[in-house]
């Protein structure tokens, strides 16, 4: 069956998709209804259970000198060693067994889904709902990715949306490519990040036992799932060298997943078009979407953060949406929230940069 037909079948037959629209207001010259042009943060029909990931245009940085940058030397040393190990791993790729390649790719996609379908679209934005087996899989996959536990990841991401491009944004892209890519992890957080982050409502995360269980046992969990397991499996089961298991299956794979995620914060805030909202920094970046399994449609995502697809086009260069739709077909995901075409077109007409291409 063609992919687009299968997608329609999943969307319509197995579970409901909540369509989000803006209420009609004035009448166009041709007699059609015009969608209300209120700012996103004032719309009434977003998720009733979470609004702390909606951009707040009223927040401005405080005037005055910037605080002194404090380096976290432990992180600097560990990140440097990781990337040196990953570079060495690249040279070892030709010597790896075929199953080690497959293992690395498998681990890459599963851990990436732990971030994209898990920490991001499910727990940060509540853009769909997941039953226990899927939540359990995603919490394990997220631990495999080792990008902070879900609670901390979601807190920082909600702050990133609500206070975007300010000092309260943990990876503020106005501080440059390197800072928004990895530098924000190598220095102490700006005081504004701590101050405004403490005001966010995280009660939904605190009420979820799986999220808090992961947070409680995160250190032993990440050691096992991100480092020990991916190293031991190829070494034990198909006789891969211990060196290749460490530097290719573990260090290189982990570094690639990290940088794919970081490019959403850096490249997708600096390079690309802004067809949905030219007034915000995030861009549409196809290359980022390829590496981050669907997270590169960033101008759309910041315009409509509650859309479970993080894109207008669902499966187009968006493996994460494909995965969520497959889970919906199995009855494990439901209440997927999708913005209506009318609301999208109204936003494009109001704030787009003129580079929108339908389809």
UniProtKB/Swiss-Prot annotation:
One of its GO terms (cellular component) is nucleolus. It is found in: Endoplasmic reticulum membrane. Its cofactor is Fe(2+). Substrate binds at residues 75, 148, 155-156, 188-189, 262. Its main location: endoplasmic reticulum. The chain crosses the membrane at residues 73-93, 98-118, 218-237, 242-263. Expected to bind 2 Fe(2+) ions per subunit, instead of the Zn(2+) ions seen in the 3D-structure. GO terms for molecular function: iron ion binding; oxidoreductase activity; palmitoyl-CoA 9-desaturase activity; stearoyl-CoA 9-desaturase activity. Its EC number is 1.14.19.1. It catalyses: octadecanoyl-CoA + 2 Fe(II)-[cytochrome b5] + O2 + 2 H(+) = (9Z)-octadecenoyl-CoA + 2 Fe(III)-[cytochrome b5] + 2 H2O; hexadecanoyl-CoA + 2 Fe(II)-[cytochrome b5] + O2 + 2 H(+) = (9Z)-hexadecenoyl-CoA + 2 Fe(III)-[cytochrome b5] + 2 H2O. PROSITE patterns: FATTY_ACID_DESATUR_1. Residues 94-97, 238-241 are lumenal. Fe cation 1 binds at residues 120, 125, 157, 161, 301. It is a multi-pass membrane protein. Residues 1-72, 119-217, 264-359 are cytoplasmic. It is an enzyme of class 1 (oxidoreductase). One of its GO terms (biological process) is positive regulation of cold-induced thermogenesis. A motif (Histidine box-3) lies at residues 298-302. The histidine box domains are involved in binding the catalytic metal ions. Stearoyl-CoA desaturase that utilizes O(2) and electrons from reduced cytochrome b5 to introduce the first double bond into saturated fatty acyl-CoA substrates. Catalyzes the insertion of a cis double bond at the delta-9 position into fatty acyl-CoA substrates including palmitoyl-CoA and stearoyl-CoA. Gives rise to a mixture of 16:1 and 18:1 unsaturated fatty acids. Plays an important role in lipid biosynthesis. Plays an important role in regulating the expression of genes that are involved in lipogenesis and in regulating mitochondrial fatty acid oxidation. Belongs to the fatty acid desaturase type 1 family. PANTHER family: ACYL-COA DESATURASE (PTHR11351), STEAROYL-COA DESATURASE (PTHR11351:SF102). This is Stearoyl-CoA desaturase. It comes from Homo sapiens.
């Amino acid at each position: 069956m063609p992919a687009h037909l299968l997608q329609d079948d999943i969307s319509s037959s197995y579970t409901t998709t909540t369509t989000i629209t803006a209420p009609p207001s004035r009448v166009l010259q041709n007699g059609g209804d015009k969608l209300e042009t209120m700012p996103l943060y004032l719309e009434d029909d977003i998720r009733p259970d979470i609004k702390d990931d909606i951009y707040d245009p009223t927040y401005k940085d405080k005037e005055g000198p910037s605080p002194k940058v404090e380096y976290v030397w432990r992180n600097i040393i560990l990140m440097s060693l990781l990337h040196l190990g990953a570079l060495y791993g690249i040279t070892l790729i030709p010597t790896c067994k075929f199953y080690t390649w497959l293992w690395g790719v498998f681990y890459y996609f599963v851990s990436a889904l732990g971030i994209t379908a898990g920490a991001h679209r499910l727990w940060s934005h509540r853009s769909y709902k997941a039953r226990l087996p899927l939540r359990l899989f995603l919490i394990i996959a997220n631990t495999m990715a080792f990008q902070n536990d879900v609670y901390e990841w979601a807190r920082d991401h909600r702050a990133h949306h609500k206070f975007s491009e300010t000092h309260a944004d943990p990876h503020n892209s106005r501080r440059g490519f390197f800072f928004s890519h990895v530098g924000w992890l190598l220095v102490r957080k700006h005081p504004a990040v701590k101050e405004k982050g403490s005001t966010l409502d995280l009660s939904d995360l605190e009420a979820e036992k799986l999220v808090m269980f992961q947070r409680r046992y995160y250190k032993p969990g990440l050691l096992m799932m991100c480092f020990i397991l991916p190293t031991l499996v190829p070494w034990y089961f198909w006789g891969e060298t211990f060196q290749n298991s460490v530097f290719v299956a573990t260090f290189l794979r982990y570094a690639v997943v990290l940088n794919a995620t970081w490019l959403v914060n850096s490249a997708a805030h600096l390079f690309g078009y802004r067809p949905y909202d030219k007034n915000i920094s995030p861009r549409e970046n196809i290359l980022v979407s390829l590496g981050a399994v669907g997270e590169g449609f960033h101008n759309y995502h910041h315009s409509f953060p509650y859309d479970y697809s993080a894109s207008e086009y669902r499966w187009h260069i968006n493996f994460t949406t494909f995965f969520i739709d497959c889970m919906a077909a199995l009855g494990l995901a439901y209440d997927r929230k999708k913005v209506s075409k009318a609301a999208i077109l109204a936003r494009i007409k109001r704030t787009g940069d003129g580079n929108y291409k339908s389809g």
